[in-house]
């Protein structure tokens, strides 16, 4: 499946929630009727079946983290093999992706921008260039901006935006040095309450 390259707000309207695909503290302004489905007049949302609700939740989380369908299913399979709660394991695997960590640290204004930074070899992990967005970041790994990329205006702008966001407790960032430490995997209570991971587990368990 190809990566979606269309309007980002259209995806958020489809899911009925802010997927944080646009830069800024509040990604969607009041002019975007997020509660309306895509379309000129915003089609009415019909009552979804149980399967439909589960599918929408999966699509919402998949799009939020910018992961393709096959990748997402593989993350679920890995989460199911791990000890503990499968849904929480899934969210931790997604949070541990390098592109997501770069976003959480504020080096990219969006996950898509963070993914570009990784792909363009602007990111170091423990002093070594890593250009794989899905790279698994481990506890105490140090993620930083490569020296020759530190003057990029978009990185500086992203750090300014990040100053206005709530700072993740599982990450420590030095904006001046443009580096951060992934202290630990986030607990479920650290993450968005707007995600119902149990619906995804139920979907894939069928």
From Swiss-Prot:
UniProt KW keywords: Ribonucleoprotein, Ribosomal protein, RNA-binding, rRNA-binding
Example of a GO MF term: rRNA binding
A Pfam family recorded for this sequence: S4
GO cellular component: small ribosomal subunit
Leader peptide range in chain numbering: none
Domain annotation S4 RNA-binding: ranges: 96-156
InterPro entries in the record: Ribosomal_uS4, Ribosomal_uS4_bac-type, Ribosomal_uS4_CS, Ribosomal_uS4_N, S4_RNA-bd, S4_RNA-bd_sf
CDD domains per the UniProt record, alphabetical: S4
A single BP term in Gene Ontology: ribosomal small subunit biogenesis
Family in the record: Belongs to the universal ribosomal protein uS4 family.
Complexes and interactors: Part of the 30S ribosomal subunit. Contacts protein S5. The interaction surface between S4 and S5 is involved in control of translational fidelity.
NCBIfam families, per database record: PRK05327.1, rpsD_bact
Function: One of the primary rRNA binding proteins, it binds directly to 16S rRNA where it nucleates assembly of the body of the 30S subunit. With S5 and S12 plays an important role in translational accuracy.
Protein name per its UniProtKB record: Small ribosomal subunit protein uS4
Organism: Vibrio campbellii (strain ATCC BAA-1116)
